[in-house]
Amino acid sequence: MITDFQVYIALMAALLASVLAIRLGATLYQ
């Protein structure tokens, strides 16, 4: 059973991962 809290944590983790990936990509392109 998946709770709303687990969904919230998963969404925040995905958002953080995407932000880190974008920042890493921008750094490499410089």
UniProtKB/Swiss-Prot annotation:
GO cellular component: chloroplast thylakoid membrane; photosystem I
Pfam families registered for this protein in UniProt: PsaM (PF07465)
Keyword Membrane tagged: yes
Membrane topology note: Single-pass membrane protein
Keyword line: Chloroplast, Membrane, Photosynthesis, Photosystem I, Plastid, Thylakoid, Transmembrane, Transmembrane helix
InterPro entries assigned: PSI_PsaM, PSI_PsaM_sf
Example GO biological process: photosynthesis
Presence of keyword Mitochondrion: no
Family: Belongs to the PsaM family.
Protein name stated in the entry: Photosystem I reaction center subunit XII
Organism (species): Thalassiosira pseudonana (Marine diatom)
Primary gene name: psaM
